[in-house]
Amino acid sequence: MSAHTTAQSAQYNQSATQAALVPMVVEQSARGERSFDIFSRLLRERVIFLTGQVEDHMANLIVAQLLFLEAENPDKDIHLYINSPGGSVSAGLAIFDTMNFIKPEVSTICMGGAYSMGSFLLAAGEKGKRYALANARVMIHQPSGGAQGQATDIEINAREILKTRARLNEILAERTGQPVDKIEKDVERDYWLDAKEAKEYGLIDEVLERRPASL
């Protein structure tokens, strides 16, 4: 068996195990009994989970859920729970742009950790409705790249990374209220914050220990 096939098999087994561990919710109605996985049931309450690596497949699922909930009710808030190490910039920006595109306001709640693109999306929530649980951690840093190939291609990719970094810094400055030059300095290396520090920095608006009436 090739290394590629082995990796695919391991990934499939992991996905199958995770799927088997998803709790099911059974509801009774006049029409009978219906079963939902827990995430589908929470989606009915306008709750979306952004957990794990930010990549294209996950971004497509998040975007689809945002658009679906907008179609269901364009005037009611959506709650995006985040526990993510970050990932692809393009995938993250697809989610970010959709959050801004739709009519409902999107509140963001960090549980566990929001790092890299995860912290970017945490800050992207509706101002006044960005939260972190008491022991959550947040980390911001600059985008990374691993360009290979001819020297000219590497140079082109380097320019693109710098352009992307500048754009992300501008957005973070707007979302946090921090000067762009401070953002540029802070993201040069991994910049870690606890929940209280994330509030002081402007990445979130409130630290939560108990559920407020608005959530």
UniProtKB/Swiss-Prot annotation:
GO terms for cellular component: cytoplasm; endopeptidase Clp complex. InterPro entries: ClpP, ClpP/crotonase-like_dom_sf, ClpP/TepA, ClpP_His_AS. Pfam families: CLP_protease. It is an enzyme of class 3 (hydrolase). The keyword Cytoplasm applies. Its EC number is 3.4.21.92. It comes from the Bacteria. It catalyses: Hydrolysis of proteins to small peptides in the presence of ATP and magnesium. alpha-casein is the usual test substrate. In the absence of ATP, only oligopeptides shorter than five residues are hydrolyzed (such as succinyl-Leu-Tyr-|-NHMec, and Leu-Tyr-Leu-|-Tyr-Trp, in which cleavage of the -Tyr-|-Leu- and -Tyr-|-Trp bonds also occurs). It is found in: Cytoplasm. The keyword Hydrolase applies. One of its GO terms (molecular function) is serine-type endopeptidase activity. One of its GO terms (biological process) is protein quality control for misfolded or incompletely synthesized proteins. The active site is at S116, H141. Belongs to the peptidase S14 family. HAMAP family: ClpP (MF_00444). Fourteen ClpP subunits assemble into 2 heptameric rings which stack back to back to give a disk-like structure with a central cavity, resembling the structure of eukaryotic proteasomes. Cleaves peptides in various proteins in a process that requires ATP hydrolysis. Has a chymotrypsin-like activity. Plays a major role in the degradation of misfolded proteins. This is ATP-dependent Clp protease proteolytic subunit. The gene is clpP.
